[in-house]
């Protein structure tokens, strides 16, 4: 492996001069810099990131933490988040991904290990993790969950508005008996989506039936089980809003298992717009949440914060988009 000392020997300069030239120092004459850069290219020189990190007191690592990777995080949500962050971080950074619930303690989360952290937060149980990061003065951006600390850059989607729009679509299609399969209890996304559901019913003077609210776990199995409970009611709903697409797919399978059809017998709307949602039969109407866009923006904001620590914190709310497909039946003509 070619080192700085090898280049220095061939260029007949000190290794300090080579190091400065490779880092585009203004203190190195242009002709010397050009000679060194040409030699580095000819020799296929690759910087030793670990050595550079020690010298600059930087880890060149970005931490991407989820509340949990195994509980309540769908494959598509996980993939879109990583894809978005990877689009934004430069080749100078490594990405380390972990679930907070996998950590025994926070001792390993230090400025020496992470230049900055992106937290894809799903619950206020993350607050102790946020406090730790702040205490260690590690640059931080929080995604997905609305937080009260206005000194932290916070980026999320308007889930309440998105779910309200979905339920209003049911109402405009003539549905009155509308149920909800909720997400994981304690998750902010679950709360926001239920609030949107309730707001739509209240604004349109539709009675709220508590038996139409069934809890799920953001997975297909819980969606299936929740739908079975709704179908067992004396007066089953004609429409069901599911707090994510995985549960919507599970709910549709429960409907099919009873010999019923979507949307002829029961209409279904999901949330997230996972890639699979437009390839099932019928194609699932759903609320598209801009997870990848939020992740790209979060990584960009973190890089700005790393380079300019005095960057002002901001709260950014991204809009959702309702995707009309084939899973809702119109009862009114």
From Swiss-Prot:
Gene3D superfamilies: 3.40.50.2300, lambda repressor-like DNA-binding domains. Disruption phenotype: Cells lacking this gene express the exu locus genes (required for hexuronate utilization) constitutively. Its absence additionally confers the ability to grow on minimal medium plus glucuronate, which cells cannot do in the presence of ExuR. Signal peptide: none annotated. GO terms for molecular function: DNA-binding transcription factor activity; transcription cis-regulatory region binding. Induction: Induced by galacturonate, repressed by glucose. Transcriptional repressor for the exu locus which is required for galacturonate utilization. This is Probable HTH-type transcriptional repressor ExuR. It comes from Bacillus subtilis (strain 168). The gene is exuR.
């Amino acid at each position: 492996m070619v080192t700085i000392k090898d280049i220095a020997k061939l260029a007949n300069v000190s290794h300090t001069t080579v190091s400065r030239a490779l880092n585009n120092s203004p203190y190195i004459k242009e002709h010397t810099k050009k000679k060194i850069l040409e030699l580095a290219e000819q020799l296929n020189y690759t910087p030793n990131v670990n050595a550079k990190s020690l010298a600059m007191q930087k880890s060149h690592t970005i931490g991407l933490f989820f509340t949990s990777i195994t509980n309540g995080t769908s494959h598509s949500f996980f993939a879109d988040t990583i894809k978005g962050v990877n689009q934004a971080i430069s080749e100078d950074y490594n990405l380390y991904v972990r679930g907070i619930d996998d950590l025994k303690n926070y001792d390993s989360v230090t400025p020496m290990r992470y230049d900055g952290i992106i937290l894809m937060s799903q619950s206020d149980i993350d607050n102790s993790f946020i406090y730790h990061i702040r205490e260690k003065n590690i640059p931080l951006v929080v995604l997905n969950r609305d937080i009260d600390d206005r000194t932290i850059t916070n980026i999320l989607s308007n889930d309440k508005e998105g779910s309200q729009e979905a339920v209003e679509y049911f109402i405009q299609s003539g549905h009155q008996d509308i149920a909800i399969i909720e997400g994981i209890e304690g998750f902010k996304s679950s709360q926001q989506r239920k609030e949107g559901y309730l707001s739509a019913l209240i604004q349109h003077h539709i009675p709220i039936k508590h038996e139409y609210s069934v809890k799920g776990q953001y997975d297909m199995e819980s969606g299936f089980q929740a739908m079975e409970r709704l179908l067992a009611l004396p007066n089953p709903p004609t429409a069901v809003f599911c707090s994510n697409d995985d549960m919507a797919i599970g709910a549709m399978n429960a409907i099919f298992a009873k010999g019923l059809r979507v949307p002829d017998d029961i209409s279904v709307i999901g949330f997230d717009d996972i890639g699979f949602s437009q390839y099932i039969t019928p194609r699932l109407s759903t609320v598209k949440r801009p997870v990848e866009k939020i992740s790209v923006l979060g990584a960009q904001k973190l890089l700005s914060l790393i380079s300019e620590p005095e960057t002002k914190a901001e709260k950014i709310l991204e809009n959702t988009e309702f995707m009309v497909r084939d899973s809702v039946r119109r009862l009114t003509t």
